[in-house]
């Protein structure tokens, strides 16, 4: 359990700090 929490945390920290995902992944804003 401890290892899973650590990995998740780490993963959350990496996502957060990391750069934003490509526009293709995220939802595209509408043209309006």
UniProtKB/Swiss-Prot annotation:
It is an enzyme of class 2 (transferase). It is a single-pass type II membrane protein. Its cofactor is Mn(2+). It is found in: Golgi apparatus, Golgi stack membrane; Secreted; Cell membrane; Cell projection, Filopodium. One of its GO terms (biological process) is lipid metabolic process. It comes from the Eukaryota. Its main location: Golgi. One of its GO terms (molecular function) is N-acetyllactosamine synthase activity. It catalyses: D-glucose + UDP-alpha-D-galactose = lactose + UDP + H(+); an N-acetyl-beta-D-glucosaminyl derivative + UDP-alpha-D-galactose = a beta-D-galactosyl-(1->4)-N-acetyl-beta-D-glucosaminyl derivative + UDP + H(+); N-acetyl-D-glucosamine + UDP-alpha-D-galactose = beta-D-galactosyl-(1->4)-N-acetyl-D-glucosamine + UDP + H(+); a beta-D-GlcNAc-(1->3)-beta-D-Gal-(1->4)-beta-D-Glc-(1<->1)-Cer(d18:1(4E)) + UDP-alpha-D-galactose = a neolactoside nLc4Cer(d18:1(4E)) + UDP + H(+). One of its GO terms (cellular component) is basolateral plasma membrane. Pathway: Protein modification; protein glycosylation. Keywords: Cell membrane, Cell projection, Glycosyltransferase, Golgi apparatus, Lipid metabolism, Manganese, Membrane, Metal-binding, Secreted, Transferase. The soluble form derives from the membrane form by proteolytic processing. Its EC number is 2.4.1.-, 2.4.1.38, 2.4.1.22, 2.4.1.90. This protein is responsible for the synthesis of complex-type N-linked oligosaccharides in many glycoproteins as well as the carbohydrate moieties of glycolipids. Belongs to the glycosyltransferase 7 family. This is Beta-1,4-galactosyltransferase 1. It comes from Rattus norvegicus. The gene is B4galt1.
